[in-house]
């Protein structure tokens, strides 16, 4: 845990050591769950590559998975326990990301030539089964 400023600095530096910030999700959590939390890719909007179809979509997709994981702990099911569907969706998305990173396709920041749409479609297809 860190303040917003230091959390932002750390969330930028950590992923940069991997060679790309296109993989890093981010979450600003309200632990009391009484105010909204924020889930976004570390790289932000990447205006320098807007419209070129070369951005790595993994961080955005993974941020959505983080949101589902967070919701799994805050949304009780009919039995009062955390709703397992959120956790299952999170796990399916993360597994699809992992498989895509191992087998491809890969965007230019990962040494490949796949477009944003191709990478996103590959992950979506794996989630869909």
Regions found by a protein language model. Name each.
Residues 107-129:
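Short, amphipathic C-terminal "tail helix"
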Residues 2-92, 96-103:
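Glycine-rich phosphate/nucleotide-binding loop
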